[in-house]
Amino acid sequence: MFVRVLVSNVVWLALVAAAPVAPDLAEAFGARESVEQISLSPDGSKIAYIAPRPGQGAALYTVNLADGQPVMAASVDGDPERLTRCDWLSNNRLACRIFAVVASIEIMPVTRWVALDADGKNSKMLSQSEQLNQRYATGYGGNIVDLLPGRDGSILMDRWFVPEAALKTRLADEREGYGVVRIDSRTLAATVVEAPVRFGVEFLSDGQGEIRIMGTQLPSSAAGYSGSKVKYSYRAKGSKRWEPFSEYDVLSDEGMNPYAIDPALNAAYVLQKLNGRIALYRVSLDGSLRKELVFAHPQ
């Protein structure tokens, strides 16, 4: 009898131990993604991914797929810097975007791009440094317009040019507006590719170093607030002259909104409404602006 009871108790304990534990829904709801962003090197031999760290922190890890061992190349604690994305510039160099909210005189969002090797060494600030003689501050650190495949670490980045105050000098840079520069991520040597446009808001490259589309957004009033319409211009292949392309309303989604350029087809891919829904079109950049539907979903 004693043996039978003992065996029954052991079996009952085993069943209790094997019973599934209900998940902590609150913990699962608040959990961060184990991989927040990932990218593959141009030759396919390495990956880079951003993973969370304790608190608000995050780290960039690179992995050589030959051995599969992750290496921490960079990290931030999240107070206030946030690591938002990293892209390969070459087979051994990356550019990472850092976002922060800085509270000084007022609360201001700030972005900066930093280039570094896959092992975290040789870091360089790609975003333009602010100078004391600039007429105003900007938190915009630019964005990558073209990774320039095959250029071994050089890229095209957009930049907001801030004019300098001519304090006891005649060498102040008075350029202002939205332009594009080519930057060597190792030496930081920079060349202006597109001169700043006062009301420029967007540039699209063909992926081979040629800027083919530009967007401008005029203010809606004397107060300087941006209007809702973006006017897009394009360049024919081999030309530097801007031609009208489309007008897009950011509030109503009316008009053609260009997203990418196919250099082989000499065409732009745009989103535009079709029967009240967004559809994908291909528009020729040969001067005809011939448009053909690529994809539309009935629902």
Which ranges hold each PLM region?
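N-terminal secretory signal peptides that target proteins for export/translocation
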Residues: 1-3
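Bacterial N-terminal signal peptides
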Residues: 5-16
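Beta-propeller folds
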Residues: 19-299
